[in-house]
Design a protein with these regions (language model features):
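Short S/T/G/P-rich N-terminal loop/turn motif that feeds into the first structured element of a domain
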Residues: 1-48, 82-100
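Short hydrophobic/aromatic beta-strand micro-patches
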Residues: 8, 53-55
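An amphipathic, aromatic/His-enriched active-site/gating alpha helix that lines ligand/cofactor pockets
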Residues: 30-31, 35-36, 55-88
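A short pocket-lining beta-strand/turn micro-motif at the edge of beta-sheets
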Residues: 49-50, 73
């Protein structure tokens, strides 16, 4: 399964709490080895998180990786397919709807 992982800092803390959380998330990240194949990590320019593009046959491994960072980051996993596959699926859906 291909996926895009979106991560953002958890909201709600004071400035000092947010700074401590940011520091800890960077420490954890420096010691972490992904359980899934990560093709690309990118950070948002505004410092409010980022995205990872990856692939796995084990969704439970991805869940474990997200759980490691859950005290510091909100993670949203978007399963994705190649755009050509998406276009083929949409074309089949249009054909189905036009026939029925």
């Amino acid at each position: 399964m291909k996926f895009v992982l979106q991560f953002t800092p958890r909201a709600g803390g004071s400035g000092q709490e947010n700074l401590a959380s940011m520091k800890r998330s960077v420490e954890v990240f420096s010691k972490w080895t992904p359980s899934t194949t990560m093709h690309q990590f990118v950070a948002r320019i505004d410092g409010q998180g980022g995205f990872a593009v990856g692939e796995t046959d084990d969704p439970a491994a991805l869940a474990r990786d997200c759980a490691i960072f859950s005290p510091y980051l909100d993670c949203v996993v978007h399963p994705v397919i190649e755009v050509q596959e998406g276009v083929a699926a949409l074309t089949a859906a249009v054909d189905f709807n036009e026939k029925h």
